[in-house]
Amino acid sequence: MLQFSFQNCKTHTCYMNTSVNEHLDQDESFLRILIDTRKKIRSSYFKPQTFDEFVHCLARVRAMKRLVSICSNFDEEDNWNGVWNTLVVDGDSHASAMIDYEGLLDKCSLSRNLLELINDYAEYTTQVLPFRKIPSSDNLDSSLNLTVASPKSNLYYRYSSESPKYAKILDCPDEILQLIFSYCYDASYIEKLPFAFSYRKQRHTLIHDLPNTCLRFKKILSPRNVSFWKRLLKVHKKNPNSAVTCSESINTSAVAKFTDIPTIIPIFLDPSYQSYAAKTIHSDTSSLASSIIQTGDGTQSCDESTYIELACNLVGRCVLCNRIPKLTKFKDCITSFYRPSVATNICDQCLEAIIDFYEPVSRYKFDVMKDRLGVGYISRPGQKFPSWLSEHVQLARDEEKAFKSIYHSQGEFARSLFRLFRAQLAELCEQ
């Protein structure tokens, strides 16, 4: 049993409590859209209707199994085994009699653990998967924060005696996306070409509100990143109609201190990403240029290859930084750009910045993160504190690799399995 310590970050605890309470119910309509979208994603995951959906399911299963195989928290395992072995070796019959080992394990382990559920789905059974109950932690005392290792799966779950709530595999509550938007959406950014010169002169919530651990994202917009600014300056000189120049003064008073969470993202919320992929990947550079930027009169399009390269390869279009996906030779590159668990497009660099923000949050306020996420935490070997978002990134990368492998190398075999899956599903519906 572990006792989590938050002594290193007491100064941030009050800030996190206030911020979480501020943004939970900020936009009900946006939250409703996300809930509906994620319902569609979950239904398509458990009952894929097309071959592409089926391949995505297989890729997700393979990624989950790989993640489970490499995830084992050695610190917790050693501590738990140490407590167990101490009692056994010492032969303290009185202490052993006071602890109900069997009852303690029954409360913390699944009747069928997560790995067995994944194996069931990997065998293409059509039964509804039973989900474990995850207790509420609203009034959970810190002394009851137990982390116990399941002897079969090396996964670690949180337990309390409070009233349970239900959670599903790969199920992340919608509040997490609202927090992501609230903390990482930069309200002061106005889309201009080039955005860099105005960006460097203003104070921005995205950069300044992130902890010092956010190194990757800071390096991109750092004044010391000379090559980055040279590329943008080159683009700026080739586009004289740009409204902002390096010497212009910026009216910071006109910048809104706060704007609502952006809700105009219908194309990013579409679980079937094929329509968006067709519009971006299969379009030629001329149409891409005209869709990216237009000059002041609105009639001539920019055909500068430098800017196209910048817009396509620098960050990519996402709901946070508003750039388009990278154009690669793989048509399914959009699958890693679209994040199924949060039902929206987030580029790798913004997601890394989000992770850099949430990892320290989970360390100094574990109860809040556990309550908001509602899922068991797992961590890699050598990672002392568990965090959900880092595993989400690893899962997305593994899923992308698995999708390419299945689709290109095992296509015929996957099609045979899909026919078998549909046949079993039809038999189940007839019953």
UniProtKB/Swiss-Prot annotation:
Gene Ontology biological-process entries: cellular response to oxidative stress; regulation of ergosterol biosynthetic process; response to oxidative stress; ubiquitin-dependent protein catabolic process
Matching InterPro entries, A to Z? F-box_dom (IPR001810)
Pfam families registered for this protein in UniProt:
F-box-like_2
| GO cellular component terms, semicolon-separated | cytosol; endoplasmic reticulum membrane; nuclear outer membrane-endoplasmic reticulum membrane network; nucleus; SCF ubiquitin ligase complex
Q: What is its main location?
A: cytoplasm
Q: Which residues form the F-box domain?
A: 172-186
Superkingdom to which the source organism belongs: Eukaryota
Keyword terms, alphabetized: Cytoplasm, Endoplasmic reticulum, Nucleus, Ubl conjugation pathway
Record's subcellular location: Cytoplasm; Nucleus; Endoplasmic reticulum
Expression induction or repression: Expression is induced during oxidative stress.
Role this protein plays:
Expression is induced during oxidative stress. Plays an essential, SCF-independent, role in the stress response to hydrogen peroxide for survival, by negatively regulating ergosterol synthesis via direct binding to the squalene synthase erg9.
Q: Whom does it interact with, and what assembly results? A: Component of the E3 ubiquitin ligase Skp1-Cullin-1-F-box (SCF) complex. Interacts with skp1, cul1 and erg9.
Query: What is the protein name stated in its UniProt record?
Result: F-box protein pof14
Q: What taxonomic classification does the UniProt entry list for its organism? A: Eukaryota, Fungi, Dikarya, Ascomycota, Taphrinomycotina
Gene name? pof14
